[in-house]
């Protein structure tokens, strides 16, 4: 029990607590696996949708019931229905209908931190993950940019809620999520395969569980390493005031980013009637000319 409590605390401080709970990512991975199988077998999309919905129900039944599982299951069912009708799934619409429907049927869910965190994370990913990925893609590899964008987008929308639960900010959540991201998908799929085969093929289930354990070992090592760092968290004001402060800080950073982006676009606009862009828009040119002028000045060459 002591080790479990310490591990949970380290996961929370390192910002990867979501890995210890069933989330929408598990449902997405399972749906992707079923879709690939359906395409390989040339199955009708309606039959594939039925299989996806069935897998969703089995996964939800096998997991410990939770508010995040409820949200993921309902959204997954909407996605399966869209697939059956041949329509592209609309995550934002599905999320809105899910939240409204759940709150109408069960108003008590409005006080659930798990449901709020799950919904906020999905909202952040849907709205901003793509944009952040394109921005980060200019300086990072595509896969790394996507992982970082999803982490940042989810963190931005869940931080105000996290502050209500625990008055501290996880400063190392982005590097922690980047370190474990390559292993999450593999561990999830092999873990689910182990669960599905345990009743009929225990030996093969053991192999899948062993493979999955290597991924979870990486997560445990990252959590213990980063979560034990004194710089892992930053104390913050608690309560509604703390949530409002972090929300204002995020809005301020967002407004500053928009202003800087607009300024850069304005500077990079081509001059009317002239080829190319303004001189100040290319930092490499400025740096090269500065180096050349400095070298000429120091060498005493006035020609």
Predicted regions and their residues:
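Intrinsically disordered terminal tails
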Residues: 301-303
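Hydrophobic alpha-helical transmembrane segments in multi-pass membrane proteins
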Residues: 4-173, 238-298
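Membrane-embedded alpha-helical segments of integral membrane proteins
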Residues: 119, 208, 213-217, 221-256
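Alpha-helical transmembrane segments of multi-pass integral membrane proteins
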Residues: 125-231
């Amino acid at each position: 029990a002591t080790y479990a409590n310490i591990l949970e605390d380290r996961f929370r401080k390192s910002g990867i607590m979501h890995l210890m709970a069933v989330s929408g990512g598990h449902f997405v991975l399972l749906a992707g696996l079923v879709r690939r199988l359906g395409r390989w077998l040339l199955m009708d999309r309606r039959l594939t949708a039925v299989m996806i919905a069935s897998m969703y129900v089995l996964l939800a039944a096998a997991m410990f019931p939770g508010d995040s599982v409820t949200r993921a299951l309902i959204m997954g069912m909407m996605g399966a229905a869209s697939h059956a009708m041949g329509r592209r799934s609309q995550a934002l619409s599905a999320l809105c209908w899910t939240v409204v429907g759940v709150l109408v049927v069960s108003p008590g869910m409005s006080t659930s931190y798990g449901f709020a965190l799950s919904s906020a994370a999905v909202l952040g990913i849907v709205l901003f993950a793509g944009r952040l990925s394109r921005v980060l893609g200019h300086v990072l590899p595509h896969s790394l940019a996507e992982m970082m964008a999803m982490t940042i987008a989810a963190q931005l929308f869940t931080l105000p809620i996290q502050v209500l639960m625990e008055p501290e900010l996880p400063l190392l959540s982005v590097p922690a999520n980047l370190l474990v991201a390559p292993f999450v998908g593999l561990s999830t799929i092999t873990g689910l395969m182990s669960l599905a085969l345990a009743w009929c093929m225990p030996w093969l289930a053991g192999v899948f569980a062993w493979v999955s354990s290597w991924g979870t070992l990486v997560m445990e090592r990252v959590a213990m390493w980063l979560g034990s760092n004194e710089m892992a968290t930053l104390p913050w004001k608690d309560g509604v005031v703390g949530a409002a402060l972090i929300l204002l800080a995020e809005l301020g950073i967002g407004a500053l980013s928009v202003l800087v982006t607009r300024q850069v676009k304005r500077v990079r606009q081509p001059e009317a009637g002239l080829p190319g862009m303004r001189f100040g828009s290319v930092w490499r040119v400025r740096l090269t000319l500065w180096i050349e002028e400095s070298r000429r000045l120091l060498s005493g060459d006035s020609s």
